[in-house]
């Protein structure tokens, strides 16, 4: 079997650095047990990944999406419908605890500046320890 080079795959993925990232990601998937889409022919995983990209058995866009998803630490999930349903139901029912929405907005305690300063003066400073 002829060797697979970056030149064989560069027409599928425009940027050679992106190609290396995608092929490396696919090679790691193969080593973790993912199903290969071409004959192995006793090749190593990076070569199989490059052959899959060159023969277009995998979509580079799908590989890129999967790579991005695997690198994300926090995935945001949009659920605006649930929040709007809860708000509309609670406003119709008079609130969760039986209070109206106008009462909930004004339920905060209001303190004067003097009360805040008196509260700050009443705080006790913790003793210094060797923990830090």
From Swiss-Prot:
It is an enzyme of class 2 (transferase). Its EC number is 2.7.7.6. The keyword Nucleotidyltransferase applies. It catalyses: RNA(n) + a ribonucleoside 5'-triphosphate = RNA(n+1) + diphosphate. InterPro entries: DNA-dir_RNA_pol_omega, Pol_omega/Rpo6/RPB6, RPB6/omega-like_sf. One of its GO terms (molecular function) is DNA binding. GO terms for biological process: DNA-templated transcription. SMART domains: RNA_pol_Rpb6 (SM01409). Residues 90-109 are annotated as: Disordered. One of its GO terms (cellular component) is DNA-directed RNA polymerase complex. Belongs to the RNA polymerase subunit omega family. This is DNA-directed RNA polymerase subunit omega. The lineage of its organism: Bacteria, Pseudomonadati, Pseudomonadota, Alphaproteobacteria, Hyphomicrobiales. The gene is rpoZ.
């Amino acid at each position: 079997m002829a060797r697979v080079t970056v030149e064989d795959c560069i027409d599928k993925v425009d940027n050679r650095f992106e190609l290396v990232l995608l092929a490396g990601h696919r090679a790691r998937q193969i080593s973790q047990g993912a199903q290969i889409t071409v004959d192995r022919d006793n090749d190593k995983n990076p070569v199989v990944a490059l052959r899959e990209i060159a023969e277009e058995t995998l979509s580079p866009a799908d590989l890129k999406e999967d790579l991005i998803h695997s690198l994300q630490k926090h995935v945001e999930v949009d659920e605006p419908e649930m929040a709007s349903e809860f708000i509309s139901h609670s406003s119709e029912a008079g609130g969760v605890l039986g209070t109206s929405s106008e009462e909930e907005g004004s339920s905060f305690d209001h303190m004067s500046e003097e009360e805040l300063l008196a509260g700050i003066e009443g705080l006790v400073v913790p003793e210094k320890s060797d923990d830090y």
